[in-house]
Amino acid sequence: MSDTLTRLAQVLEERKGAAADSSYVASLYHKGLNKILEKVGEESVETIIAAKDAAVSGDCSDVIYETADLWFHSMVMLAQLGQHPQAVLDELDRRFGLSGHVEKASRPSA
């Protein structure tokens, strides 16, 4: 895993036990999963809008910025659920070289 993701995961874990007023992340943890999920949804929409704008303008700087926000809040969500980002990277590694059609067919039915 990249050093940046490792360092961020460590900071997110450290902030779990911090006072709500000590940091933005600590305040999210204190507000609970629903607030964190709200932020993930908000950042998802902002990323989509930035991508649509970039397709027209050719400037991807906002896409990068919004994707960073989306990844960040997704990592907060994972940490709140007791998961480490390495689990996501492991899942991507598992899928590497696997046809998307095969991977989708192997998922349990809902």
Swiss-Prot record:
One annotated Gene Ontology cellular component of this protein: cytoplasm
UniProt record, GO biological process: L-histidine biosynthetic process
EC number: 3.6.1.31
Subcellular location: Cytoplasm
Record-linked InterPro entries: HisE, PRib-ATP_PPHydrolase-like
Keyword line: Amino-acid biosynthesis, ATP-binding, Cytoplasm, Histidine biosynthesis, Hydrolase, Nucleotide-binding
Primary location: cytoplasm
Cross-referenced Gene3D superfamilies: MazG-like
Classification via Pfam families: PRA-PH
GO molecular function, one term: phosphoribosyl-ATP diphosphatase activity
Protein name in the entry: Phosphoribosyl-ATP pyrophosphatase
Source organism of this protein record: Pseudomonas fluorescens (strain Pf0-1)
